[in-house]
Amino acid sequence: RKFNNGGNRKTKGALVATGCIVGVFVLTNAVLVASVLVPYGLGLPNYCGIGLYLLLSTGMVFFCLAGRTLRQEVRMTFEVTDRSVEEGRRQVARIVGRDTSNLSAQEVRTAALETLAENLSDGVVAPLFWMLLLGVPGMMTYKMVNTLDSMIGYRTERYERFGCWAAKIDDYANYIPARLTALLIVFAEKLMRWKRTSVKWLMGFVGRYGSQHASPNSGWPEAALAGVLDCQFGGGHNYFGVYFYKPFIGDYPRLLTTADMWRSLQIAMAVEMMMVGLMLLVMLIG
């Protein structure tokens, strides 16, 4: 708020975003190096430094991953919406940025599954992807990139200029992970054998709708999940009092059910396990 006023908001926003991102990368590296060197400097056995390093690294990894929490929130959203639309609106507001005060039960459920798909990329696949490339510091740095985007990367009058750099960095950081997430969703569905459609058809569906989203990345995992469920995502929503239209993803605007929620959660779990397996495979080969 201190920097987001007056002139040169775009430059100020770029400096703030760059400073935060570089700062997290440097600080994380420094902390992890110190966790090994400090015990050694104090004359402690080597395993003390190694143990501290592993403890801190593990804590950072779990801090960056949001798969379990997201699945719980989505499940709770469907459960409370079955009881009361008003409760569902309050629950889904915990995981989406849009105005939920006037959403119907169908829109609440749709918002929850859209968020599950999008954050399967942002909260699981992308952090692990950047960990694979740049280690734990890369994972923590990605977390900062994603956090900045969720805080200031909005196309509103207040943040359009100040947050544009943060939003652009987030777009670049998620470009490969978003498409990888869509691919993993398709493969996860094929492993579960829910649909008789081919991988080629599903990939064609993803390619047709993934690029139509207002975001260059969010549409890909959302299109993959919509294709798996035979449903429709998208439509207009209010964000901080501003109306945004998102093109529809899918051709079948049917009502979503609890069965769709459970299928989506199973897909999410499968994608997480496949991504971890892919990481281990690359590390072994490398």
Give residue spans per PLM region.
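Hydrophobic alpha-helical transmembrane segments
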Residues: 1-140, 153-286
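Active-site His/Glu-centered metal-binding helix of metallohydrolases
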Residues: 144, 148, 152
